[in-house]
Structures are given as C-alpha cells and as structure tokens.
Amino acid sequence: MRLETMKQTPSSPVNIAMQDSFGCAVENRFQQLLDDESDPLDFLYQSAVEVTHRKKKEEGAAKKNANQKSGKKESQKDRKAVVVGGSTDVKVTQQTGQKRAPKNTEKVTQNENVDSQVKVDRTERRTAFREVRPNIMDRSAEYSIEKPMEIMDQDKQMRNYGGRGGMRGRGRGGFPRNTESDNLRGKREFDRHSGSDRARMRPEDKRGGSGPRNWGSIKEAFSEIEAVPVEEQVETTETEATEEHGKVSEETNDDGFSQEMSLDEWKLLQDQNRSKTELNLRKPETSVPSKAVVIHKSKYKNNISENEEESQYCFRKPVNDITAQLDINFGSLARPSRGRGGGGGRGRVRREEAFPHDVINVLADAPNPDDPEDFPALA
C-alpha cells in the first residue's frame, strides 16, 4: 500500500516547483496507522485532566510564595513609612484580608533571586573544590616526622607540570592534583599488620628502651639487678662454688696438682664411672636329653663319601638322596651328522654307526608305599 503526499503544502511558486520536480512515495510497511484502535474522546478527556493538574500546581506554588513573603520581617523603610504616615490600620487590613496573587513583576524578581542564588552556590562550590578537605588536614598533622626536603621539591615539580599542555589525556590539568598517593580522597585507611609509618618506633619509645627492635635501656638493667634480693644471690653463689669445687677435686690429684692423662686413660676412667647394665644371657643347650630316641636310621647315610659332601657343600640335600649313586652314560646316544645334509659321496650306501644302540634301564623299580625308606615323608 503506497500513500502519496499526506498533507497539502501552502500554495507558493517554490512549493509547486518542488512538487513538480521531486516526488516522494511513502510505504506503510508495518501498518502502523491501521493498528491505532484508540478512541479520540479518550484523548480529549486525558488532555482535560492534565490541564486541571497543571492549574492546581500553579495555584499551590502561588500560595507558597505569598506565605513566604508575608512571613518575612519588615525592613526599616517600612517601619519609617508606618510611623510617618500613621497608616497602621491599612497594613492590618491588608494582612487579615484575602491574600492576593503575585503579579508578573513579583515573578520576575523571584526569578532574579533564584539566578543569583545559583551563581553564589556555583562560586562556593568552586572555592570548596580547591580548598583542602578536613580529613587530609588531619592526616598531615598525625605524622610526627616532618617531610624531608627532597619530597617537597618533588611535589613542587609535579605541580609545575600541571599547566595547560601537561600530560596528554588529562585535559587542561596535566597531572592529577592529588600528588600524594597515600592521601586519596574519599577512601578509608586501614592500619597494616606488617607495619606502616604509624607503626614505626617513636623517639620517646627509643629513649625509654621500649618498642620493637630495641635492646632496652641501662635503667632497666639496673632496676632488674636491684629487684633481686640479697639472699637469692648468696644461695646462687654458694651452689656455683660447690659445683666448681667438685669438678676441681675430680681433676686434681691427692697432692693438689692437676693430672695430665691421655685420651685412652680418660676414656677408661669414664667407663669405670659409668653404670654398667647387667644382661641375663642364656647359653644354648648342647647336651642331648636322656629321653631322646632314634626312630630309624637311613640306609644310604653311611655309603655317601666325604669327598662328595665336600665338593657339594653349597647344595642342601636330604639325607636319603640317591641321585649320586646313579651312573648316567651319554656315550651310547646317536650323534648328529656334520656337514651338508648327510654324508658320504655319490651313490654310496649310508654306512652304519659304529656305536651299538644298547638300551639302558635307568629307571628303578616302583617304590613300595609301605616301606618308610621309600616314602620318608609319609613316615
């Protein structure tokens, strides 16, 4: 849906020429005009309500201004006029009667007064912004040590930088006005546990010997010595004398001279003086008990030679081991042929081996389970 010119412009040669040369096509894509379903009577009612509210506000403001003027004190000029003219009754009637609404001239004077108050407030704010605040003054007074001259010079240099072309990104001011990083405006201060300027040692503490990192004063040492009673000192001196006398008596000889000895002799003396610990040790019983009885003797124990035992001392063998009595001969076994694949020249018959194949019965007879010699573990 396209809508051409919505309103007709006033007839003028310029407008007519513009309409002929230029055209504008308006397309209502979102159908905003069709969605408006409100009643025009509602709009009229709302506008009337708004007008009444405005009138009430204006009347209330006028009453407040009239009350403020009536509550002001009379100036000296008004008093003189009353005394000279003698028209006190007129004044009373005016005050007791209905309050009149302020005129346009009075409104103008009120606006002028408001403008002057705003100007005064702005000037006061500017002066207050440049003044030093009370919290900064208190903090500077808390330090007992004066600021050194080097820091003062640095502060002056930083202030001189703050001209018109000072640091970029700061506008006209250059450096920030708060040169001291500690005195940040509007932030609380907390005492550091690790130590700060306030926690440092004061000169009074240092003179008196108190405070951290101080070795004390001479007065404290004398006061501690005086506080100890005389009897305790006498007892301590007596105990020290007895201990020293005992040590000297041990080291000295009968003649009263100190004895020189070597390290071994001194160790012997120490061992003699040292208390010895007595241990109740038992020796193993070598004697055979009288009630011991031999159950059976092995058959093969006596046949084993001593030489074989000496040569094979490292291996633990049972008493009835018969492996040493077996005669094993590996010479009767067939030897493999050497060389390439088997043997002699061409066309010859394979010769027989010189060693006969004798079958040797290595295995013994089956053991008898009833005999304890054959089954020693079952006995």
From Swiss-Prot:
According to its UniProt record, where is this protein located? Nucleus; Cytoplasm; Cytoplasm, Stress granule; Nucleus, Nucleolus
Q: Can you list the GO cellular component terms from the UniProt entry?
A: Cajal body; cytoplasm; cytoplasmic stress granule; nuclear speck; nucleolus; nucleus
Identify one Pfam family in the record: HABP4_PAI-RBP1
Principal cellular location given in the protein's record: nucleus
Q: Name one GO molecular function term.
A: translation elongation factor binding
The residue ranges flagged as biased composition, category Acidic residues, are 232-241, 368-379
Bias (Gly residues) ranges: 162-174
Bias (Polar residues): 107-116
Sorted keywords for this record are: Cytoplasm, Nucleus, Translation regulation
GO terms (BP aspect): positive regulation of RNA splicing; positive regulation of translational initiation; ribosome hibernation
Q: Where is this region: Disordered?
A: 52-260, 332-379
Top-level taxonomic group: Eukaryota
Where does the record place Basic and acidic residues bias? 71-81, 118-133, 139-158, 179-208
Q: Which InterPro entries match?
A: HABP4/SERBP1-like, HABP4_PAIRBP1-bd, IHABP4_N
Q: Which family does it belong to?
A: Belongs to the SERBP1-HABP4 family.
Subunit-structure text: Associates with ribosomes; promoting ribosome stabilization. Interacts with eef2/eEF2; promoting ribosome stabilization.
Q: What does this protein do?
A: Ribosome-binding protein that promotes ribosome hibernation, a process during which ribosomes are stabilized in an inactive state and preserved from proteasomal degradation. Acts via its association with eef2/eEF2 factor at the A-site of the ribosome, promoting ribosome stabilization in an inactive state compatible with storage. Plays a key role in ribosome hibernation in the mature egg by promoting ribosome stabilization. Ribosomes, which are produced in large quantities during oogenesis, are stored and translationally repressed in the egg and early embryo.
| Name under which the protein is recorded | Intracellular hyaluronan-binding protein 4.S
Q: Which organism is it from?
A: Xenopus laevis
Q: What gene name is given for the protein in this entry? A: habp4.S
